[in-house]
């Protein structure tokens, strides 16, 4: 006999929409605005600042992924928090049927993250438009319930959050992704689709940052998830319970204070 465990997956837009709807049913207010800074009074964060107005809060949870790094640095907090730019092809709905998720047996992205977060690379992350280490390609394909595919992925360590990508570079990435997938799924590799990118945050030790900052009251972190759809749902509930006063020893290994730099706020 054999034990077959299929790898589960979710539709990110649908999952996020469902969480927002559940949040509002419980009485929460969902506002969409670009956060430009965190409001700080001495050693306490008291809210967030947007282009429109400031929103006061007794407790702020910074869950901004790759954008958390510049927001923290504006407060003088330096943490080994980085990001990759993930590139993929998204197709329209297709009559082809993929019976399982296809992905590399050995994922190169985690080795890339380790190389890019070495101590001698730290200064490069503070310079704009740098590529810290060469990109990697982990060939994969996944099909969603509406029939559309995501084909990936190339990971780049570009220091700028909005690094410009020319049409030529997009076409080159498209060709690389299709060429890597063609030996495995030739029909899928030729499906028409559009190039996309997104930012994926990670930390120097591979674990997310979950919990309060030891140097600033009123601010907790929930970022650095290199595999968010596995870890975010259970850890979000546990952080909420911890903020409500329920001690959770299981979060100790994820506390931002495990990094020495989290305990210093230079210039403040």
Where are these regions (language model features)?
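C-terminal lid/capping helical subdomain adjacent to the catalytic/cofactor pocket in oxidative enzymes
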Residues: 28, 42, 46, 213-268
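Short, well-ordered alpha-helices that flank and scaffold nucleotide-derived cofactor binding pockets
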Residues: 17, 21, 25, 73, ...
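Beta-strand segments within the central parallel beta-sheet cores of soluble alpha/beta enzyme folds
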Residues: 35, 193-194, 251-256
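Helical element adjacent to the flavin cofactor pocket in flavoenzyme catalytic cores
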Residues: 2-59
